[in-house]
């Protein structure tokens, strides 16, 4: 995910844990920007790329869950966008602007459970089955019994969830499926390296600007424009941090409560709590989701994914970075013409962020080729050779 997703493909990117394009350390702290140049790492609001935002309420046995969606467009099929693990719907921001300018379509970018601004009663359940049901429930809550034509597009973990959703027939009006940057074989091979990758990431950041700068310099996201909007959905303020004065009073309160403990353990406990709070004060931003704690679900996301993808009886598109490799099942399926594939060179794992225009062109061409959507502004299809 630039976090989890990238780690899952450790074996195929040239820059695993040394991250792509860097040739340097994971932290990216020593990477050079070029003499005399200063880039703008300030965050950009979602409203520069999406037309509206909505919190969709879904009823279930435990109560109400609220799913954040970002929307654009008013005509044509709905492109339902599912992000990778650790990311959010905002990772689709630049792609949204690009695709809307090429074909008539509607965008619905969804924050999956435990990600972004979505709030659910059971955030620990990240099984493929549960997340696929979430997608179906959101579609039903938004459109009722007569949903418009929908194409599912997912990146990495989101691509796997799109496939599980499609194979379970949870979206009745589904007309197409697109999987980006995920292949079962390489994903499964990389699972053993994932925890090491996650441990190598910074745990906290001094500011949003600092987080954005790290994501670009480390190679997590190679496109600064996308990073400036996408990273806002990946990090959050540490809990309990409001102001320096507020933080100080919290530390003092902790110390007073500890005074009744035995002297030896008391001083150690106090120092640890003070150190933790000082870290939060100096680095008040952290990741929205602790991906390392989701390990028990990783296998379920990707095992059997190739056959599930091939079995979906709808037009399918697979977009891969230049370093991706097809596994045996996908290779045979591609030779048999069971799906359209396009390789986008010079991209990292976050293909749709690194090259949003190329991905938009590929998706737009797919939509027009199958007569799912009409072109806009004289857009000319470029049909790939594979």
From Swiss-Prot:
Q: Which reaction does it catalyse?
A: [phosphatase 2A protein]-C-terminal L-leucine methyl ester + H2O = [phosphatase 2A protein]-C-terminal L-leucine + methanol + H(+)
Domain of life from the UniProt record: Eukaryota
Compositional bias per record (Acidic residues), positions renumbered to this chain: 254-265
Q: PTM comment for this protein?
A: Phosphorylated by SIK1 following increases in intracellular sodium, leading to dissociation from the protein phosphatase 2A (PP2A) complex and subsequent dephosphorylation of sodium/potassium-transporting ATPase ATP1A1.
Q: Which UniProt keywords apply?
A: Hydrolase, Methylation, Phosphoprotein, Serine esterase
Q: Which residues carry this modification: Phosphoserine?
A: 15, 42
Q: What is its EC number?
A: 3.1.1.89
User: Residue spans with biased composition (Basic and acidic residues)?
Assistant: 268-280
Q: Please list the GO terms describing molecular function.
A: protein C-terminal methylesterase activity; protein phosphatase 2A binding
Q: What does this protein do?
A: Demethylates proteins that have been reversibly carboxymethylated. Demethylates PPP2CB (in vitro) and PPP2CA. Binding to PPP2CA displaces the manganese ion and inactivates the enzyme.
Q: Subunit details for this protein?
A: Binds PPP2CA and PPP2CB.
Please identify the protein, giving its name as recorded: Protein phosphatase methylesterase 1
Encoding gene (name):
PPME1
